[in-house]
Amino acid sequence: MKVRTRSKIKFDNKAIDKINIDDLDFSFVNKAGEVKFRRQLVFPFDVPNKSILKGLKLCIQKSTGSKLFWLQFWFNGKADYYSVGKRIPGSWGVNEVEDKLLPIVRSHTNDKGHWIKSPVESEKKKALEDQRLIKFYFASSS
């Protein structure tokens, strides 16, 4: 997934809410000189390099106008994205992102801040375990 980034934005609910989808340009000119359109734009946040927020980005979808928090990380020599959540004004914002990321970053990185486990893979494993538990519960109760 090749995604181009834009200028850094402040990690603040007001700064995120100020971004208006109508003001954004999703078009670009490719090497052949044709005008193409992106499905999303990605904006990195202006956060300290040594914080748990390192690699956090705001993804704005063209079709829906949704603002999503993504965490970009390197694991096994490859860049990957973890979807942290969707920005919902008044109920889900920067404080909730910090609360969700703290245990994930602590359990998936070493002392140097290098990723030792992928949060994407961990989430998939947890979902499979939950499905097995639900199947076992309903199979034993009937």
Which role fits each region the language model picked out?
Residues 1-139:
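Basic/aromatic DNA-contact patch characteristic of tyrosine site-specific recombinases
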